[in-house]
């Protein structure tokens, strides 16, 4: 469980996760696994669910430079997810999420230097160079399907488990998310998809070569809230983002967030 209290806005947020795991004891205890996750409560969430900036970094950039990059909203939520992993290298996942989304507003413009107060921005994402996207309270019901597969997976067989040795082939992934309207008051209606390929090559004395390429888009964008846009993991802080393979070090956090029919992006390390 997690408990969060805002001393300025006096909001109490509390939420918890329950995970249930099962294994195939007949053959091995690790490679074949099912996981059920139940979550619910009231929380504060970044608009980009990949959490491009952490709380400590955002606090430091705000206090020292007046740059409050983290943009968040409050939500009552409930979710259920199921994942199953097979020893063949196949992994599937299903999830359903309900959110009652509530705007959060700044309650202070405090910085260590008064001259930096003018840099403080609203707690809403800025698309492009200056297009601030506001939203009003609404509800959303989302269902998602994920599948990933790494062909040619090899293992070492032990008496009660298997140890994966990897594969010479990349990992392929697919995600489909549907925003369903008129269920539990849901106000969203969209369909989006993403296909990805990634790999980590050991070049021995030359080091390692990692890459990740994704293509996707919106098949239906009839009613898309800013929380459900396609976001990219940018970085505007004065320090490098931790995961080079899934982030863009010089990209503004929400500059290219979109509901386009098609997009493609990639990372190489």
Question: What is the meaning of each model-derived region?
Answer:
Residues 17-21, 111-114, 184, 228-231:
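Charged/polar, low-hydrophobicity segments characteristic of intrinsically disordered regions
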Residues 11-30:
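Strand-loop-strand
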Residues 50-203:
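Transmembrane beta-strand segments of outer-membrane beta-barrel domains in Gram-negative
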Residues 29-32, 165:
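Short helix-terminating capping/connector loops at secondary-structure junctions
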Residues 3, 16-22, 40, 80-84, ...:
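Residues on the lipid-exposed face of transmembrane beta-strands in outer-membrane beta-barrel proteins
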Residues 6-10, 23, 41-47, 83, ...:
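Structural signature of outer-membrane beta-barrel domains
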Residues 35-56, 60-73, 133, 164, ...:
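C-terminal outer-membrane beta-barrel translocator/porin domains of Gram-negative envelope proteins
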């Amino acid at each position: 469980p997690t408990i969060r209290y805002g001393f300025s806005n006096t909001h109490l947020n509390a939420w918890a996760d329950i995970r249930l795991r099962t294994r195939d004891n007949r053959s091995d205890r690790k490679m074949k696994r099912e996981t059920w996750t139940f979550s619910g409560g009231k929380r504060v969430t970044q608009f980009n669910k990949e959490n491009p900036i952490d709380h400590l970094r955002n606090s430091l950039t705000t206090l020292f430079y007046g740059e409050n990059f983290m943009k968040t909203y409050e939500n009552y939520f409930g979710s259920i997810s199921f994942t199953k992993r097979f020893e063949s290298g196949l992994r599937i996942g299903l999830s359903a999420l309900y959110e009652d989304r509530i705007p959060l507003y700044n309650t202070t413009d405090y910085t260590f230097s008064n001259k930096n107060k003018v840099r403080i921005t609203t707690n809403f994402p800025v698309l492009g160079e200056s297009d601030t996207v506001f939203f009003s309270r609404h509800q959303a019901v989302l269902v998602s399907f994920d599948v990933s597969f790494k062909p040619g997976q090899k293992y070492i067989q032990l008496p009660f488990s298997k140890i994966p040795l990897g594969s010479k082939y990349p990992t392929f992934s697919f995600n489909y998310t549907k925003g369903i309207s008129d269920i539990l008051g849901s106000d969203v209606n969209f369909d989006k998809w993403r296909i990805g390929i990634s790999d980590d090559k050991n070049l021995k004395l030359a080091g390692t070569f990692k890459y990740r390429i994704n293509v996707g888009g919106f098949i239906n964008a009839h009613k898309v809230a800013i929380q459900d846009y396609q976001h990219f993991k940018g970085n505007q802080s004065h320090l490098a983002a931790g995961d080079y393979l899934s982030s863009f070090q010089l990209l503004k956090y929400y500059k290219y967030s979109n509901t386009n029919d098609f997009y493609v992006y990639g990372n190489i390390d």
